Amino acid sequence: MALMSALTASAYAQEVKYIEAPKFEGQIYLYGEPDKADVEYEQWYEIQNRGQFVRNVKVPALIPYLPEESKANGAAIIIAPGGAFLHHTFGSGGYEAAEWFRSQGFAAFILKYRVEITPREEAEYQKYVADKMAGYRAGGLSGNYAPATPDYAYEDINAAVKLIRERANDFHIKPNRIGIVGFSAGALMAVYNAECAPLECKADFIASIYGQLVMRDMPDKLPPMFAAMSSDDELSGQSGFEIIQAWQKRGIVELHLYGQGGHNFGMGHEPFTNSLWPAEFLAWLRMIGMINAPANEAKIRLNNGLDMPQYAKPTDLAHTVRQQNRHMMQSLRH
């Protein structure tokens, strides 16, 4: 499934400016050296106040944002942008996320996964999107516009985890400290990976950021999941929380439901409290022992029988990280 994020008429009422494809240092193709024509088929563009987008992606790749070795915390984050599997939103849920996670010591990778091939002319593309949305509404899906997720998107997220795990030494990370942070459609990929991927392709933790929480048949054990969304999100906020209750029985899960902020808030929009999710996510990772775990960690036994590291005063940590996060976001946006 996918969410029709950033595809509303209001988004496209603004001027669309097509640009040359950015040159990414160290870009890693998932399946070997690609055909040049397939790479050049991508279409990159900008929308005022919304950042960069790319559509017609035929060749999946990882775009690395690696920290200085002295600052590395040993963990990796794969960032899966949103865009309804029709495009990628590379602004706050792409570049900004990668820069922030790198600043916190993570080896960050933006996953440019394959998306649906759409009309190249802008007017035809807008009509194509409008027709799709009309079809979803006519199908009785209310605010949750959820077409089928392409199998190749799932293949790409699994391949990305496997590649990074196999090259853990190259990236100065631990092979059991690889996570996925997915935004909107990318969040669906993260949840799918946690539920369905083979062991060698499965992430060690995931974050679902304003993703629709879709209930599937679940395995007995699941990796830790952090979920964040706004209660007024007309795309994802109405899907219910059955999956959260089911996850509690199979693993560690934390849900942050913010009162306002809508959909597509990326790394957070001040003054909304969703601007705190990166700091809360970082504190959560420390609490569950994914980063900065002490050598002689104490354990607490959860109701579901799982052991979890226990740390002193996690609220103090969260407060400190929130302050750091606020300063970082301000510097990135100016």
Say what each PLM segment does:
Residues 124-169, 277-280:
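Alpha/beta-hydrolase active-site loop
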Residues 15-71, 103:
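N-terminal cap/lid segment of alpha/beta-hydrolase-fold proteins
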Residues 151-222:
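Primarily recognizes the serine-hydrolase "nucleophile elbow" in alpha/beta-hydrolase
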Residues 73-82:
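Short beta-strand element of the alpha/beta-hydrolase
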Residues 252-334:
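C-terminal catalytic histidine-bearing segment of alpha/beta-hydrolase fold enzymes
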